[in-house]
Amino acid sequence: MLFRSEALEFFSIKVQDGPLTSRLQKIREGDIILVGRKATGTLITGNLIPGKRLLLLSTGTGLAPFASLIKDPDVYENYETIVLAHGCRQVSELAYGEHLVDGLRNHEFFGPLIRDKLVYYPTVTREPFRNRGRITDLIASNQMFDDIGQPGLDIETDRIMLCGSPAMLEELPAIFTARGFVEGNHSQPGHFVIEKAFVER
């Protein structure tokens, strides 16, 4: 791997008595953490059919799985453009995403390779900001694509990963399906994939 870090980053909200976060928030220096070698779950690029533009659509802490994807050189080899959209209520909630993307773009070795391929699109719903609105609405209206100066959704070239609020994970797949996009999984790759952990209630 071209970009490798010895550090693990966790971006999460604290869930009272949550099975994972109640333990994560108590981790201290020197604690042992076991990490598997193989990625699991539904947000795996192998669950997508080949394409040219990868849309990573997130709200809130749904940005977390994309933090590792945008550091993966294979993603940049397989896609011409990677669009990372991050929607939050307030501007202050965008801080981690901005820090993450700025760090990658300014990385001594990785930055020059990804600078022209990675498009970051932050948006908020409750405060004045250069991009305003819910990701769902910005996709449906084509506003996000207009804002970044790129063509709208194209089933031939676009592949999509979703992670975030239950509302987004319910609404966007309906929009994509209505346009002919097919959800992918381990046995049958498709045009888009959803982080199921957020969907199941």
Could you describe each region identified by the protein language model?
Residues 1-29:
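Ferredoxin-reductase
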